[in-house]
From Swiss-Prot:
Gene Ontology cellular component list: cytosol
Superkingdom of source: Bacteria
The gene coding this protein: ilvD
InterPro entries cross-referenced by the UniProt entry: Dihydro-acid_dehy_C (IPR042096), DihydroxyA_deHydtase (IPR004404), DiOHA_6PGluconate_deHydtase_CS (IPR020558), ILV_EDD_C (IPR056740), ILV_EDD_N (IPR000581), IlvD/EDD_N (IPR037237)
PTM annotation (N6-carboxylysine): residues: K124
Residues given in the record as Mg(2+) binding sites: D81, D123, K124, E491
Keywords for this protein: 2Fe-2S, Amino-acid biosynthesis, Branched-chain amino acid biosynthesis, Iron, Iron-sulfur, Lyase, Magnesium, Metal-binding
GO terms under biological process: isoleucine biosynthetic process; L-valine biosynthetic process
Residues engaged in binding [2Fe-2S] cluster: C122, C195
Protein name per the record: Dihydroxy-acid dehydratase
Main enzyme class: lyase
Length: 611
């Protein structure tokens, strides 16, 4: 039976000094011997998804203490991708995932904590904490800050649902007046919480439900709704129970690596494909699997993407549908329930709150439960009042959306599309694969041939798009923006948003070794692997080359002969794999350290150290 890790610092004559320091934090004689639970918070006033978390760590801490544990809170960093976007700040976003994972590992191992509650929300914070949980393999429960309410605005007599992406697209559209842009900007992000569509933050918080590491509703319950408080309260009690089950009863089924095994990762990826999650989730799922030693890779994602249909379309794929609508339709447990009916989910994986995922679905799927509590929970609605305060409203929908034929969440028999929401493409331009969010691609361009317009950076691409260098039928190629080449693998939301604003959203394609915001839609293909900086063929594309994209057949190819590609490769090897012209980019020592060990996107952009 494993001993509590914390005994290392709380027991024995030689630990008198450590106990003295513990006492200085408020611990008493009666606390030594209780499980010490790390409350891993990520409060910051920089990020709307985290601005309301300040007091929530202490809410969880009090519940831990009431359940018989000792709670010790600390904070991680949190980068807002939307604020960091469009300038060199975006170079820091993906590397911050590793800093977060490292900081959690450092704090938990340095102080010998027994278990942890991870309070996350936005783009790299949930993945960073997930990586840490898989590394540490101690009992862990995830509880996020929740999604923000969708913006609502009346424009020219019509009520429109808004989010962050609408503000960006409107700002670049010359046909929209300055006054309308201001109205959209002021209404797009009305409350605290993670941005309201199926963007990266919400996608990842939904996936923790499928992995079995968070409570039902974690991904969809609004940050402002009073129902969300229950998740924090329950997390505090639950983690003490999990710690006792492991350390006192030798129950390894409560450990992250047991819960999030390969079958659980397949469940999570199936959910991701069905709900049309952000392409960034592929990076983060691959990274978490790597950290936990789980044999799950691009070939598994490719296999699943060929059989899992798209059951839900949420902004940016469907602009009038947001996370509050997903919640009303039953949230993630409903999507998992529909997948389970189709034989596309493994019911036998463990969760932190039920014996198995199948048990959780039976209890929490609104189309099969008899629980009025569950039905009321999923009626939680937006309050419609701008606020930065958590749990500040208790509005409810009059009814639930259970329409499996035409509602927000569809059945396997009547999906939005038989093809899932994400796909892996292979070809001579991406031998190790690349990713496209098919849920956001118009059916008319699922097959696309176009001429390459090549840019050596996102900045150059933005300038070119706004300068009308790109026309209908083109394929924009943005390279040297991968994990090493950027460094940091910037998101390309501005180029895709500007293509939309120029009326080219359904007339062009974009391929990059960088990545995309969860807010991106259109024929946007990212994560081209190997990246240009590692000798990937995306670095061999030349202006005017024909590129052929075939999503139904999962291929992407540069229509150049093998002999010509070999000649270009030999020439590039002599020059070195770097942009043709120097870029005005401040690459600091911290970023260089990340780039030195970063792998390509097909490996999750994790750091791989030489043997």
């Amino acid at each position: 039976m494993p001993a509590y890790r914390s005994r290392t610092t709380t027991h024995g004559r030689n630990m008198a000094g450590a106990r003295g320091l513990w006492r200085a934090t408020g611990m008493k004689d009666s606390d030594f011997g209780k499980p010490i639970i790390a409350v891993v918070n990520s409060f910051t006033q920089f990020v709307p998804g985290h601005v309301h978390l300040k007091d929530l760590g202490q809410l969880v801490a009090r519940e831990i203490e009431a359940a018989g544990g000792v709670a010790k809170e600390f904070n991680t960093i949190a980068v807002d991708d939307g604020i960091a976007m469009g300038h060199d700040g975006m170079l820091y976003s993906l590397p911050s995932r590793e800093i977060i994972a490292d900081s959690v590992e450092y704090m938990v191992n340095a102080h010998c904590a027994d278990a942890m509650v991870c309070i996350s929300n936005c783009d790299k914070i949930t993945p960073g904490m997930l990586n840490a949980a898989m590394r540490l393999n101690i009992p862990a429960v995830f509880v996020s800050g929740g999604p923000m309410e969708a913006g609502k605005v009346v424009l020219h007599g019509k009520t429109v649902a808004l989010d962050l992406v609408d503000a960006m697209v409107a700002a670049a559209d010359d046909k929209i007046s300055d006054e309308d842009v201001k109205i959209i900007e002021r209404s797009a992000c009305p409350t605290c919480g993670s941005c309201s569509g199926m963007f990266t933050a919400n996608s990842m918080n939904c996936l923790t439900e499928a992995l079995g590491l968070s409570l039902p509703g974690n991904g969809s319950t609004l940050a402002t709704h009073s129902d969300r408080k229950r998740l924090f309260v329950e997390a505090g009690h639950l983690i003490v129970d999990l710690a006792r089950r492991y350390y006192e009863q030798d129950d390894e089924t409560v450990l992250p690596r047991t819960i999030a095994n390969k079958a659980a990762f397949e469940n999570a990826m199936s959910l991701d494909i069905a709900m049309g999650g952000s392409t960034n989730t592929v990076l983060h799922i691959l990274a978490a699997a790597h950290e936990g030693g789980v044999d799950f890779g691009m070939e598994d994602i490719d296999r699943l993407s060929r059989k899992v249909p798209c059951l839900s379309k949420v902004a940016p794929a469907k602009q009038d549908v947001h996370m509050e609508d997903v919640h009303r339709a039953g949230g993630i447990m409903r999507i998992l329930g529909e997948l389970e009916r189709g034989g596309l989910i493994n019911r036998d994986t463990y969760t932190v709150h039920e014996a198995t995922l199948g048990d959780a679905i039976d209890r929490w799927d609104i189309t099969r439960t008899n629980s009025e509590m569950v039905r009321q929970f999923f009626k939680a609605a937006p309050g419609g009042v701008p606020t930065q305060v958590a749990f500040s409203q208790s509005s409810r929908w009059d009814d639930l959306d259970t329409d499996s034929d035409n509602g927000v969440i569809r059945s396997v028999e009547k999906p939005f599309s038989k093809d899932g929401g994400l796909a892996v493409l292979y070809g001579n331009i991406a031998l190790d694969g690349c990713i496209v969010k098919t849920a956001g691609v118009d059916e008319s361009i699922l097959k696309f041939n176009g001429s390459a317009v090549v840019y050596e950076s996102q900045d150059a691409a933005v300038k070119g798009i706004l300068g009308n260098e790109v026309k209908a039928g083109d394929v924009v190629v943005i390279r040297y923006e991968g994990p090493k080449g950027g460094p940091g693998m910037q998101e390309m939301l501005y180029p895709t948003s500007y293509l939309k604003s120029k009326g080219l959203g359904k007339a062009c394609a974009l391929i990059t070794d960088g990545r995309f915001s969860g807010g991106t839609s259109g024929l946007s293909i990212g994560h081209a692997s190997p990246e240009a900086a590692q000798g990937g063929a995306i670095g061999l594309v030349r202006q005017g080359d024909l590129i052929e994209i075939d999503i139904p057949n999962r291929t992407i190819n540069l229509k150049v002969s093998d002999a010509e590609l070999a000649a270009r490769r030999a020439e590039q090897e002599e020059k070195g794999w770097k942009p043709e012209a120097p870029r005005k980019r401040n690459v600091t020592t911290a970023l260089k350290a990340y780039a030195a060990f970063a792998s390509s996107a097909d490996k999750g952009a994790v750091r791989i150290l030489p043997e």
